[in-house]
Amino acid sequence: MICPRCADEQIEVMAKSPVKDVWTVYQCQHCLYTWRDTEPLRRTSREHYPEAFRMTQKDIDDAPMVPSIPPLLAEGKR
């Protein structure tokens, strides 16, 4: 299995349906894309995933952190 968005092979199971074998949620450990195996091919298959939304390593490296992580407050100001 490869990630539909970035084509990485490091995919992990995030969750399984409470009813056995109904659905499974997967997450790419590289770009963090998450999908359920019951979604349409345009969301679950690299070949069908829209070109405009595919990501390269450069896209991932250049992606802004949204929302940005604020600086940690000093011990006495928490």
From Swiss-Prot:
Query: Which example biological process does GO assign this protein?
Result: catabolic process
Which Cys-Cys disulphide bridges does the record give? none
The alphabetical list of record keywords is:
Aromatic hydrocarbons catabolism, Detoxification
Residue ranges spanning the membrane: these are: none
InterPro entries attached here? VdcD-like (IPR047707)
Xref: NCBIfam families: VdcD
Described by its record, this protein's role is as follows: Involved in the non-oxidative decarboxylation and detoxification of phenolic derivatives under anaerobic conditions, however the precise biochemical function in metabolism of phenolic acid is unknown.
Look up the further comments and give them. Answer: It is not known, if phenolic acid decarboxylase forms a complex composed of EdcB, EdcC and EdcD. The term subunit is often used in reference to the operon, however there is no experimental evidence to prove the existence of the complex.
Name of the protein in its database record: Protein EcdD
